Amino acid sequence: MSNIEPDERGLLLACPHCGKRNRLKYEGLGRTFRCAQCKNELPSPREPIDLKSDLVFDALTSRSALPVLVDFWASWCGPCKMVAPEIVKVASESAGGLVVAKVNTEELPSLARRFRVTAIPTMVLFKRGIEVARQAGAMPAPGIRKFVASVP
């Protein structure tokens, strides 16, 4: 899915200019980062971040300087497959203002239980680790953007 690898300290992103892997700390998301090697500006994440552990989920949602939209999904879910390209559009269009992440509920059922996700897809918006809104069901990209924008 991604050339971005999240861990508990931040996002590992390869520089598009020289290939050097750089760490973008969650606390600094939304500001400008420069490559440690070539000093060129690094792009903001423009694709959904695939979260693979509770620890990384907690680090991203609690420390991100930007709001984090999390898509809870499953591989067997038809509506989840339909909304996946819409999530990619939102991530690309919202780069620098919103972090978009995905949680496969089959791989991380503990997170689905913890956040009482009973229908999928479910999108949950977090600000500084606090759930501020949620929406169940598939939506096109404009509907997702409207959902995010409706939260103060």
Name what the model sees in each region.
Residues 65-66, 72-76, 119:
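Short pre-active-site segment immediately N-terminal to redox-active cysteine/selenocysteine motifs
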